[in-house]
Amino acid sequence: MIESMSNGFYLVNEPALLKEVIRFLQKGFSWTTQRSSDIFDRLNSQEHKIPIGAMLVNNIPPEILKKAPLSHYQLVLENYKWFKKFTPSYFTGYNVLAFDIEFYRRMLFKSLIPDWYQTNTRGNKLHDVLPHVRAAKYINRNVIATKLNAKGNDSFKLADLSEVGNFNHGISHTSIVDCLNTIEVAKKIKEGAPEVWEASLKTAHRTDAEKIINSKKVFTAFEYFYGKSRPFVQKHIFYHVPYRWSISWDLKHHPRDYISLDRENLSKALQSSPKIIRTLKHNKNNVIMDKELGLKYEPYDKIGINEIMERSKILDENPKFINSISSILEDLAREKQESNQIEPLFEETIYAGGLNISPKDKENMMKFHDVDVKGKLGLIEKFTEERYSYFAKCLLYEEYSKKELPESLYNEMHRHFAKRLTSTNSEKWETFASFYKECDDHREKYKDDENKLKILDGYNNYVEEMEKKFLNA
């Protein structure tokens, strides 16, 4: 059975759950298509959330924001519990790893749900159709029809594939329609390039991908840049410290041209183009195929299997050279981290703040969702990390009225959000100033569309009322 969220679909093993799936979907999951971590579609909008363009794509009027039955926090909790019913599953979507999954993780993180790796733990796996359809199209041009973009390259936008393939199930960018269109694309891959489809299922989890990398040693992996897919026949040489990604040697380059270089010149070579090493982020569901596939394409077809394996052997016989590369990349990563002195917002610390949660914080997070407002207030100071205390304050401010909260906490958080919203600088979040500019830009874009203009006027009025609550904070 197949079920949907946003522009993706998830594989479910229980047909009896279909009715529940559809009923839940009808509540609206378009919030996962939003491109801002502070804005949520089809949710009960808090007074510090500002609607922007992604809502306009789905023609969502401001009335929906005011009348939705669930707050954002309530929907996150409900969604988390709902996903648990389908564990283990493949969480599949279109470009889902670039946005949707990261978005969902951050929603769990900010909602104090400690299981923010829900979609790739306890047997769950992440599966992204976009890189697979790109690779499939490279291998077999007839897999799926595409249109050319302005640069003359195949367009892999889901809306374009749906239009050209004549399988559009409705208005693109709505959650269920995009899901159904994604399923159609997945079918095309499975039917037209079954080897790609099977390979994609085998790399849907980091540990599965590592097993393939470690067993194959030499393999073909696809990368997509400058609007085109490219196969690389490569030799895995080590896992990056500290990022844990697979670092491979591109076997179009002969190792003997680099083995004798001193550290300084080797470092320059590693940072020059064309790249002699490839970084395979194997937690991103990459397409990893047999080496023989890449040998069908330039320039590897001219090098040949014997020379490819000879180059691989040379790398095996020179561990000191490999260690030098590893050391250089580790130093470069450290320098990059040290050069970035900008203090991240608490909302940005899902990785920077460390991946492990202390047992005490995890226990308090679980309690937070089960106790009343008094109990929640009592937990604020019990968290060992400031970011968790901050998230608790945010949730209390969003979920409870002013009269239910201590005056000091309400004022603290009200001023905090007022400072953010009234900023006139270019910020990472939506401000009143950035909203009004975007609203004016959309008015110009849709000047001949009365329906869009009416919705935009509604957004403008909605935000003007919101602004009044914060100007004197």
What are these regions (language model features)?
Residues 1-35:
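Entry/capping segment at the start of metal-dependent catalytic domains
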Residues 21, 34-60, 83-194, 203, ...:
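Metal-dependent phosphoesterase core characteristic of DEDDh/y 3'-5' exonuclease domains
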Residues 55-141, 295-364:
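Conserved DEDDh/DEDDy metal-dependent 3′-5′ exonuclease domain
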Residues 202-280:
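Acidic catalytic cores of enzymes that act on phosphate-bearing nucleotides/polynucleotides
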Residues 267-307:
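A short, charged
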